Amino acid sequence: MRKKNATIKSVEVETQTDMTMREIETILKIVANTNNDNNDNNNDNEIEHETTIVIADKADKIDKIKKKLEFLDSVYQPEQRTPEWYQHRHGLITASSVWKVFGSQSTQNQLIYEKCAPIDVEKYNKVNTESSLHWGQKYEQLSKDLYEMLNGTKIREFGCIKHPNPEYYFIGASPDGINVCPLSRLYGRMLEIKNVVSREITGIPKEDYWIQMQIQMEVCRLPECDFLETKFVEYEDESAFDSDSNKENDEIKWNYNVEGKRRGVIVYFIKNDKPFYEYTPLTITSKSQFDQWFEKVVQSYDGITWIKNIYWRLEVYSCVLVLRDKAWFNSAIPKIQELWKTVETEKVTGYEHRAPKRRIVKKNDTISQNKKQTKLEFNDDGSFSQQHIENEKICHSGLFL
């Protein structure tokens, strides 16, 4: 009996692969033959039947996920960062913006104005490495690496995807990634990453993030999404990084600080006037391994400007499962459709009245250190004004230490 249970368990694990129906039938025959070699009783037969159902259910689920991912792969995608790609995104209400449909009138006006106005591709080529937006981009790959390592899986991006239903042609989503490893229990689960700068991580998604994930799951027709929030802290310099470690453990636990928190290094380069990063592999556990890796990285980018090494520590890692809510989408879609009809109409009749109102800043105005109280200021094209950008810098000062 013990031998049979062990066989059944191993078959269940093996069926979490990318299988064809022929392979599934072969596995079922193996199970049947193995069971015939034992002295079965009625209880054994019940176990065999239940196991066969489990295997078939898992195989069917894997096959469905595989077909969905193949469909997402087949969706037309303009080459990233090209004018066509920016235009493609501009012609959609993307998942990260849908929450604005349910916001105040001024928030809706902002979205309508943004979608009606001609796209300015040049503004996307500008990079502010001190912004919270860039902070999130900088740590996104590292968050993915940690997620993959902790869950034994593989994440892939699928670009900006339009809703497969032609009726909702104006809705799009760009998920941070989808689990594509068929051996993983997370196969087919989506991933949304938020690299927090200062906000407290509670494990409960903000409403706009929840809406974003619902739209992503709706567009990709997948039932689950992991909401991953991380909070990284950067050391002032290498000396501060070195002092936050046990020297005796530098050859076995260099990637953890004295409190047992994971840490590492990002190598910061500039190429074509834009930053790009190389991340220390999470498998590196000693100072000597890092030194060898760093030397190879610098040599491989010979001729490209190395700026500095960024030394980081992971303070918080929170991952929460969010399930698809079809009922919510069905109740929300009429309002999303209504706003898009307004966009299409006012592209013809005029949208200038939707422009954000300019605000004159008085000399005695003070800037709140609370980001929620910072007043938004926009240019005529709907982008943040320089004054707002400066305010944001002040609000975030001291958060990158």
Regions found by a protein language model. Name each.
Residues 1-401:
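Accessory terminal regions of nucleic-acid processing enzymes
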